[in-house]
UniProtKB/Swiss-Prot annotation:
The gene is MTHFSD. Residues 306-379 form the RRM domain. GO terms for cellular component: cytoplasm. Keywords: RNA-binding. The keyword RNA-binding applies. This is Methenyltetrahydrofolate synthase domain-containing protein. SUPFAM superfamilies: NagB/RpiA/CoA transferase-like (SSF100950), RNA-binding domain, RBD (SSF54928). GO terms for molecular function: RNA binding. It comes from Homo sapiens. It holds the Pfam family RRM_1.
Length: 383
């Protein structure tokens, strides 16, 4: 007898599904399936059903979650020569990675590319400013109803990834969402458990069925900021970049537990320095020498309206390390003056507002193990 979702909470339903799959030996590696998107016996068979969907035939770019039961779909996407996008693990360094098999990849190589190891070894990151248009989204689930209500493992990453894709214009309300589950994971889910930030699904694929849910409930229209905690902001750098963008556009980006407007989201990011070193970047001519002047009084030595000082650079840092960090945090200047031997750089922004925002966003920025000093800059005579 298959489980019935009679619990009063999402967690009740999760526990029922996990327990049933283990007790009935329906689960597959990795086990136990508790606190996971459960892999199941027959997952590859269920994945094959996606070939029968017209929406799959029409797609070119497919975003597939990295969960084990979706491995068969990732392989089919690659075999069909479609673009395969996967979420960056735990969204630590971005939103998407593109799986790029080597030229002339054999079937065995494509199979490796579809695994979690392949995601690590054959992927390249896609930047926040990349023009990505996702045609189809494939997510894992712990439980799903024939009406299209979905329950994940409880961390909220699939819902957040979708909301972030909406925010960056990668998906629209017309983009179909597919989930792949065992038949026992298709259960009744009370609609009152479904929240506005929850992603719903349009198709459910099991080893024995293809279910078109006909779900009419609107999908999330973007990031629900008041559901985002400060802890999550610290864990996910790209959230800070998206928040800064939406705040600049005049949107309400108040976080969970906040009761007043914050000047700018603080940004802290550790950027690893490259292992293989090139010779140090040659410093350009220093026509103007600047020093940090946080809180200096107006008058002589007052901050320049649009210049930001970055100090305490690691001795072996390269300009490319800093540029990468600025891109990831959405604080790219008009021009960058690099003074590596003096362990500092200057960022030149179009106006004082952009410079102030950059100073706020870059507080706590790290390159390697060194925390950088970031402040508005003042012009001084070179000594």
């Amino acid at each position: 007898m298959e489980p019935r979702a009679v619990g009063v909470s999402k967690q009740d339903i999760r526990e029922q599904i996990w327990g049933y799959m283990e007790s009935q030996n329906l689960a597959d590696f990795p086990r136990p399936v508790h606190h996971r998107i459960p892999n199941f016996k027959g997952s590859y068979l269920a994945c094959q059903n996606i070939k029968d969907l017209d929406v799959f035939a029409r797609t070119q770019e497919v975003k597939v979650d990295p969960d084990k039961p979706l491995e068969g779909v990732r392989l089919l996407v690659l075999q069909s020569k479609k673009t395969l996008l996967v979420p960056t693990p735990r969204l630590r360094t971005g939103l998407f990675n593109k799986i790029t098999p080597p030229p002339g990849a054999t079937k065995d190589i494509l199979r490796k590319c579809a695994t979690s190891q392949g995601v690590r070894n054959y992927s390249v990151p896609i930047g926040l400013d990349s023009r990505v248009l996702v045609d189809l989204v494939v997510v894992g689930s712990v439980a799903v109803s024939e009406k299209g209500w979905r329950i994940g493992k409880g961390e909220g990453y699939a819902d957040l990834e979708y909301a972030m894709m909406v925010s960056m214009g990668a998906v629209s309300k017309e983009t179909p969402v597919v989930t792949i589950v065992h038949d026992c994971q298709v259960v009744d889910i009370p609609e009152e458990l479904v929240e506005e930030h929850d992603i719903t699904v349009d198709y459910i694929l099991t080893p024995t069925r293809v279910i078109a849910t006909g779900c009419k409930r609107p999908k999330p229209m973007g990031i629900t900021w008041f559901k985002i905690s400060l802890e999550m902001m610290e864990k996910i750098p790209i959230l800070r970049s998206l928040r800064a963008r939406e705040q600049q556009a005049g949107k309400d980006v108040t976080l969970q537990g906040e009761h007043q407007h914050l000047p700018e989201p603080g940004c802290q990011q550790t950027v690893p320095l490259s292992v293989g070193r090139r010779p140090p970047d040659t410093p350009g001519p220093e026509t103007n020498s600047m020093e940090a002047a946080p809180g200096s009084p107006p008058g002589e030595g007052a901050p320049l309206a649009a210049d930001v000082y970055v100090g305490n650079l690691p001795g072996d840092a390269r300009v490319s390390d800093l540029k990468r960090a600025l891109r990831e945090l959405g604080s790219v200047p008009l021009r960058l003056t690099w003074q590596g031997p003096r362990r500092r750089a200057f960022l030149h922004y179009p106006d004082s507002a952009a410079a102030q925002q950059a100073v706020s966003c870059l507080q706590g920025l790290r390159l390697g193990t060194d925390t950088l000093r970031v402040a508005l800059a003042r012009q001084q005579r070179d000594k």
